[in-house]
Amino acid sequence: RRYRMSSDSILIVEGIHGLNDALTPAIPESHKYRIYASALNPLNLDNHTSIYVSDVRTLRRMARDNRTRGADAEKTLTSWPSVRAGEERNIFPFQERADVMFNSSLLYELHALKRHVQPLLEQVDRDSAVYGEALRMLDFLSFFTPLADTYIPQNSIVREFIGGSCFD
């Protein structure tokens, strides 16, 4: 769909492809201000074991896809390599073009997600091709104490994944 904007209009392009200039070829570079949001977890499990950003994003997606699409953990884990390939092709090449980066990770996020994703991971069948990955994720989650949803503010970004947002 085509839109005509006045000279004082503001256009917000939200979503994973928002930094791709193919979406806004008619807007001069000098009129663009790009914001990139990503879950850049600042925690380590110990002095030698960092937390992979990809793991946090996988758990976010698992919680959200289960809540919004009824997808189980096996489906999320099976589709994750395709998701990652899409990111490598359509998102990461453009992230350096951002004027500012917003870290959307929260220190309590993994505690909050655990309540929602642990039961899903425990349901992955032993015969599944992603069973090993489910076990790895469960082992990773064992470092975190579950946090009840009642302690999570309704305006927290975590609510996008677990539900109950005041913005829904």
Give the predicted meaning of each segment.
Residues 21-168:
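Conserved NTP phosphate-binding and transfer environment spanning the P-loop NTPase/kinase superfamily
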Residues 10-14, 36:
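Structural recognition of the conserved hydrophobic beta-strand(s) that form the central parallel beta-sheet
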Residues 16-19:
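Short beta->alpha connector loops
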